[in-house]
Amino acid sequence: MKFIIKLFPEITIKSKSVRQRFIKILQGNIRNVLRRFDDDARVRMDWDKLIVSSRNDQFREQAIEALACIPGIQAFLEVQASKFTDLHDIFEQVKAVWGDQLEGKTFCVRAKRHGKHEFSSLEVERYVGGGLNQHCVSNGVRLKNPDVKINLEIDGEELFIVSAIHQGLSGMPIATQEDVLSLISGGFDSGVASFQFIKRGCRVHYCFFNLGGAAHEIGVKQVAYHLWNRFGSSHRVRFTAVDFEPVVAEILEKIDNGQMGVVLKRMMMRAAAKVADEFQIPALVTGECVGQVSSQTLTNLNVIDRVTDKVILRPLITWDKPDIISEARRIGTLEFAETMPEYCGVISKKPTVKAELSRIEAEEENFDFAILDKVVAEARYLDIRRIGEETAAEVQEVETTAESGDNEVILDIRSMDEHNEKPLLVEGREVMHIPFFKLTTAFGDLPKEKTYLLYCDRGVMSKLQALYLKEKGFANVKVYRP
């Protein structure tokens, strides 16, 4: 298999040195991602494109899925590559590939060249198009809106016949910009905000302030792992979990009710800045949107920002909620967010919408900052690549099996799209489909005399859900890995 990678246009207009650096970074990113499943993948750098090749055609679908999610790629062409001698040879090769597919259809030929040739791109289009029109049973040439568009790329002595064009993610290659630390809660906003900076070329590390116990942390890890695994797996990033319950308890006891929301956000920014300093990260990212909740007025955001010199980036600051939800659906975090509890907004009954810095600072004089220092010092740092391994260790008491028994039901917990695309069929066994985001509420209604085997494609989600169900007191659960 072979693909031609078309660069995001902003890369191509950079100066020569910057463009070459960005392309080289993208080359490494693609190589890192593809070699997670295909050791034979090769990535060759050219002036305005990259060429990906592998002898392992069985990984074609995985490669297409991976390339579509790598920042910096505008589009990628699936091609058949060969050498050619002259125009007629090009025609013969194109006819062998496309001839049978033109029956009863209009078509046109589009060619792009790079290098020195005795013919122009237009001459290629005319010669190949005219030859196909004469030798194939088609409905003729139509230059505008044809039924079939045949794309050719000629680079030196190489001919690339394009069989499919796939849309890329666009954006900048990861690591062309500086690192950021995203304050992730698992909700709609923070996941989308994190994605925006992945797409813009930043390594996005994650900082989670735990207000809801182990189940909440498991859910947020799922979101962070999903974002990394789908869009950012070319680079190592960290997931930091900070137990913020002692901080909330201190706020509830010492801070005036109306000021609690702003004070809590200021404490989070202080803690996040300390975490960022630990890893020399210059900026923080939040999913805040102006006016969405009481703490997100311009006045309050200004007061919140005063606690740190770090740049606080808010990519969703003007987004409407329906647009955020739509983007969450597109990037695959919607289903996580729909079942994620929100804790931050419930601690103030009458929150201020116009905080005064002097009053906030006066309230904070009652706060014991040793508590904040302690929770940051005790924060847990995790290489996000190890989330799956850590989960496996945490659920070691949950049996993993490749077989199913007579009194066992296989539960396919993948999303609806994944289930519909590749339904799980096990001969002679009952298979039920309950998406992971409905499992928490639906599991208690299932017959308790049966044992349920949780299945997902990679085994990470099933292990996380098994741990959660175990914590809820359900013993009749296993992980299914056929």
From Swiss-Prot:
<keyword id="KW-0694">RNA-binding</keyword>
<comment type="function">
    <text>Catalyzes the ATP-dependent transfer of a sulfur to tRNA to produce 4-thiouridine in position 8 of tRNAs, which functions as a near-UV photosensor. Also catalyzes the transfer of sulfur to the sulfur carrier protein ThiS, forming ThiS-thiocarboxylate. This is a step in the synthesis of thiazole, in the thiamine biosynthesis pathway. The sulfur is donated as persulfide by IscS.</text>
</comment>
<dbReference type="InterPro" id="IPR049962">
    <property type="entry name" value="THUMP_ThiI"/>
</dbReference>
<feature type="binding site">
    <location>
        <position position="265"/>
    </location>
    <ligand>
        <name>ATP</name>
    </ligand>
</feature>
<dbReference type="Pfam" id="PF02568">
    <property type="entry name" value="ThiI"/>
</dbReference>
<feature type="binding site">
    <location>
        <position position="296"/>
    </location>
    <ligand>
        <name>ATP</name>
    </ligand>
</feature>
<dbReference type="GO" id="GO:0140741">
    <property type="term" value="F:tRNA-uracil-4 sulfurtransferase activity"/>
</dbReference>
<comment type="similarity">
    <text>Belongs to the ThiI family.</text>
</comment>
<dbReference type="InterPro" id="IPR050102">
    <property type="entry name" value="tRNA_sulfurtransferase_ThiI"/>
</dbReference>
<keyword id="KW-0808">Transferase</keyword>
<keyword id="KW-0963">Cytoplasm</keyword>
<dbReference type="InterPro" id="IPR004114">
    <property type="entry name" value="THUMP_dom"/>
</dbReference>
<keyword id="KW-0547">Nucleotide-binding</keyword>
<dbReference type="GO" id="GO:0005829">
    <property type="term" value="C:cytosol"/>
</dbReference>
<dbReference type="GO" id="GO:0009229">
    <property type="term" value="P:thiamine diphosphate biosynthetic process"/>
</dbReference>
<dbReference type="InterPro" id="IPR003720">
    <property type="entry name" value="tRNA_STrfase"/>
</dbReference>
<dbReference type="GO" id="GO:0009228">
    <property type="term" value="P:thiamine biosynthetic process"/>
</dbReference>
<dbReference type="InterPro" id="IPR049961">
    <property type="entry name" value="ThiI_N"/>
</dbReference>
<feature type="disulfide bond" description="Redox-active">
    <location>
        <begin position="344"/>
        <end position="456"/>
    </location>
</feature>
<dbReference type="GO" id="GO:0002937">
    <property type="term" value="P:tRNA 4-thiouridine biosynthesis"/>
</dbReference>
<dbReference type="InterPro" id="IPR014729">
    <property type="entry name" value="Rossmann-like_a/b/a_fold"/>
</dbReference>
<keyword id="KW-0676">Redox-active center</keyword>
<dbReference type="GO" id="GO:0004810">
    <property type="term" value="F:CCA tRNA nucleotidyltransferase activity"/>
</dbReference>
<feature type="binding site">
    <location>
        <position position="287"/>
    </location>
    <ligand>
        <name>ATP</name>
    </ligand>
</feature>
<dbReference type="InterPro" id="IPR026340">
    <property type="entry name" value="THII_Thiazole_biosynth_dom"/>
</dbReference>
<keyword id="KW-0784">Thiamine biosynthesis</keyword>
<dbReference type="Pfam" id="PF22025">
    <property type="entry name" value="ThiI_fer"/>
</dbReference>
<dbReference type="GO" id="GO:0000049">
    <property type="term" value="F:tRNA binding"/>
</dbReference>
<keyword id="KW-1015">Disulfide bond</keyword>
<dbReference type="InterPro" id="IPR054173">
    <property type="entry name" value="ThiI_fer"/>
</dbReference>
<feature type="active site" description="Cysteine persulfide intermediate">
    <location>
        <position position="456"/>
    </location>
</feature>
<dbReference type="InterPro" id="IPR036873">
    <property type="entry name" value="Rhodanese-like_dom_sf"/>
</dbReference>
<feature type="domain" description="THUMP">
    <location>
        <begin position="61"/>
        <end position="165"/>
    </location>
</feature>
<dbReference type="Pfam" id="PF00581">
    <property type="entry name" value="Rhodanese"/>
</dbReference>
<comment type="pathway">
    <text>Cofactor biosynthesis; thiamine diphosphate biosynthesis.</text>
</comment>
<protein>
    <recommendedName>
        <fullName>tRNA sulfurtransferase</fullName>
        <ecNumber>2.8.1.4</ecNumber>
    </recommendedName>
</protein>
<dbReference type="InterPro" id="IPR001763">
    <property type="entry name" value="Rhodanese-like_dom"/>
</dbReference>
<dbReference type="InterPro" id="IPR020536">
    <property type="entry name" value="ThiI_AANH"/>
</dbReference>
<feature type="domain" description="Rhodanese">
    <location>
        <begin position="404"/>
        <end position="482"/>
    </location>
</feature>
<dbReference type="GO" id="GO:0052837">
    <property type="term" value="P:thiazole biosynthetic process"/>
</dbReference>
<keyword id="KW-0067">ATP-binding</keyword>
<dbReference type="GO" id="GO:0005524">
    <property type="term" value="F:ATP binding"/>
</dbReference>
